[in-house]
Design a protein with these regions (language model features):
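Conserved short histidine dyad/triad with adjacent acidic residue
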Residues: 28, 33-64, 83, 95-99
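Ligand-binding loop in jelly-roll beta-barrel domains
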Residues: 28, 96-122
Length: 137
């Protein structure tokens, strides 16, 4: 089986607001909408929306045993683990075990997440070397 598919639609459109689900424990601060999921592997793509003024400091940071990719779609989000503001357009490919958060936002933020919970083993490059951050010239 593979990840679910769908035709074009706009999850950010006003008429789609009822599809956003409050994140348990973060009600009033953050909500999510799953865009695609593989029921066998658990791999998923979702949007997480942090509402203006959200602050998850009381919950601490987190890590996952699996890799994930994040892209800041809109707004800005402060990641305490990295001591920096993430602005719209920023991207990260997090390795398993990377600490991130807690988060806060002043204006709100939408984050695209692609997560791979089935990939808990250390990933390696095709030549057997460990994967690292993308190299720039």
């Amino acid at each position: 089986m593979s990840k679910s598919t769908t035709t074009y639609w706009n999850p950010l459109a006003p008429d789609q607001q009822t599809r956003w689900i409050p994140i348990k424990g973060l009600e009033g601060m953050a909500e999510e909408i799953t865009l695609s999921i593989d029921p066998v592997t658990g791999e998923y793509t979702r949007l997480t929306r942090f509402l203006p003024g959200a602050d998850t400091s009381a919950f601490g940071g987190k890590t996952h045993a699996y890799p994930e990719e994040v892209f800041i779609v809109s707004g800005r989000l402060y990641d305490h683990a990295f001591n920096r503001w993430l602005e719209a357009g920023e991207y990260a490919s997090r390795p398993p075990g990377e600490h991130h958060g807690p988060f806060k936002t002043d204006v709100g933020c939408v984050v695209l997440e692609v997560s791979f919970p089935n990939r808990v083993a250390e990933e390696s490059a095709p030549n057997g070397e460990e994967c690292g951050p993308a190299q720039t010239s």
